[in-house]
A protein has these predicted regions:
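Short pre-catalytic segments that frame enzyme active sites
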Residues: 40, 48-66, 195-199, 220, ...
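A small/polar active-site loop signature that marks catalytic segments
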Residues: 161, 479-483
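Juxtamembrane regions of bacterial inner-membrane/periplasmic proteins
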Residues: 1-340, 344-345
Length: 483
């Protein structure tokens, strides 16, 4: 293993003994593992576009990635990766000695590392270390680990060589190529060939054309200047894409006609077919944003994610979950539309808010969750008519510190009245009066009161109706009667 790279090392000025020391200090191989992916929330729906009675309503992720198996990747993309990044991928054992020696000579002339010679296996090793760095808990740790994983030093290259050789012993070529295409960064917070195909061309990875596949592989070396998120990058992307196409033709991966058709395809707005990024509840289906927010704030309670709240949050952040929720869009859509119709979110005459939740009797399953405000949790906010405060939930799950219950409590007073055997036709005083609040005990807190002193309760309209029957008092929401 060491002998394979010793000639190249000698050309760089590093001794063979130091090479052996670096090699011996490393494990035999590195685990590929599973990379962070998107979480997807689904709601019940019987309308057009549903799959088995459900429809996706939100995607939530730290990294926009969806891992796919080898057979779900276009052959054009597989071939483009090999042609563009590692022509001898299927014949070397992790390190392309021919490229290493050529690059080493270039480095000697340049007086430092100028790049090159990294096989797909070596690039995969590097990306695994980069990914691990990005998942560290603090910014300081992430920065230090990222710099170590990307440092332009010979030691790093040697580590990548050693681990790439071990990688080739543990995994098949198909597994390594698939892992590379799933971990690669394609710019614009897009990771992996599937997310890249969807982001830039609105297709799945298995359906990529030759021109599309080559354009995506053209991104990986310099994502910032070649990704397809902006027309400013189109020219650089096309130039690199054409180099990859020429390599594919030379290697016999495509026919002359296939090559010419792809080569003649301009990288422009007609070629790029981007799909909108919809990360988080702000990008969720407009009828599911508040429920999405409620679900995300409940992650710490999902026992299937782990034994502790910390473990649950970490697993959720790594993603890859398909969460089928209780939200029923067949009921949610009309519920939300009705709330918007009768409690306008743009109302400026008063601080008007409205919320509505429907639960299934017997199970407590939340079927609808609506609010008149438009959900917006961005730092700058969405202006009047928007909010990030979920009126349907408790403080712990997205609400504010609360609002006065007001006349909603009259319902419970009425129920207690009826439960005591009294009738709706009985007459009581509806006049305003001063009441000693110490008479009322708080049975929901330790100690139970008493709280407060005399308070002058008034009727909203200032009326003094005298004796009034309970039915009329309820219809008129007369405060004096309920006190």
């Amino acid at each position: 293993m060491t002998v394979m790279v010793t000639p190249a090392v000698a050309l760089t000025g590093i001794t063979a003994s130091s090479t052996i020391g670096i090699f011996d200090s490393l494990p035999e191989y590195i685990e590929i593992g599973q990379q962070p992916e998107r979480n997807t929330l689904y709601a019940q729906y019987s309308g057009e576009g549903n799959e088995n009675g459900y429809i996706a309503v939100a995607t939530i992720y730290d990294q926009n990635r969806q891992e796919v198996p080898y057979d779900q990747i276009s052959q054009f993309a597989l071939d483009a990766a090999v042609a563009g990044e590692d022509e001898r991928f299927f014949t070397h054992g992790g390190v392309d000695v021919q490229s290493v020696i050529r690059t080493a000579l270039d480095n000697v002339v340049a007086g430092g590392i100028e790049g090159g010679s990294s096989t797909l296996s070596m690039q995969l090793v590097k990306q695994i270390f980069v990914q691990r760095a990005l998942e560290l808990p603090t910014e300081e740790e992430r920065k230090a680990a990222y710099e170590e994983a990307t440092a332009p030093e010979f030691d790093r290259k040697l580590k990548e060589m050693k681990l790439a050789i071990g990688l080739e012993k543990k995994y098949t070529k198909k597994e390594i190529l698939t892992a590379y295409l799933n971990i690669a960064f394609f710019g614009d917070n897009t990771y992996g060939i599937q997310a890249a195909a969807q982001r830039y061309f609105s297709v799945d990875a298995k359906d990529l054309t030759l021109a599309q596949a080559a354009s995506l592989i053209a991104i990986v070396q310099f994502p910032n200047s070649r990704d397809l998120s902006t027309p400013d990058n189109y020219a650089d992307n096309e130039a690199r894409r054409d180099v990859i196409l020429e390599s594919m033709l030379r290697l016999g991966m495509v026919t002359q006609d296939e090559y010419q058709e792809a080569y003649d395809t301009l990288v422009d707005d007609n070629f790029v077919k981007p799909s909108a990024t919809t990360n988080g509840c702000i990008g969720a289906n407009r009828y599911a944003k508040w429920f999405c927010d409620y679900v995300v704030k409940n992650v710490k309670n999902f026992e299937f994610l782990g034994a502790t709240e910390t473990e649950r949050q970490e697993n959720w952040d790594r993603g890859g979950y398909q969460l089928y929720t209780t939200l029923d869009m067949d009921v949610q859509i009309p519920a939300q539309d009705q709330l918007w119709a009768y409690v306008n979110y743009n109302e400026t005459a008063m601080n008007l808010g409205g919320a509505s939740v429907s639960m299934e009797v017997g199970t407590g399953r939340v079927l609808t969750m609506s609010e008149n405000k438009v959900y917006d949790n961005t730092l700058e906010g969405g202006g009047p008519g928007t909010s990030a405060v979920n009126y349907n939930a408790d403080l712990e799950y997205g609400a504010s510190t609360g609002f006065p219950g007001g006349s909603t409590y009259k319902l419970f007073t009425l129920l207690a009245w009826l439960d005591a055997g009294k009738g709706l036709a009985e007459r009581i005083s509806g006049d305003a009066r001063t009441v000693d609040q110490a008479r009322f005990l708080d049975t929901c807190t330790d100690g139970g009161g008493p709280f407060g002193g005399p308070y002058p309760f008034k009727n909203d309209g200032g009326q003094t109706p005298g004796a009034i029957d309970v039915s009329t008092a309820t219809a008129g929401s007369v405060n004096g009667a309920f006190i």
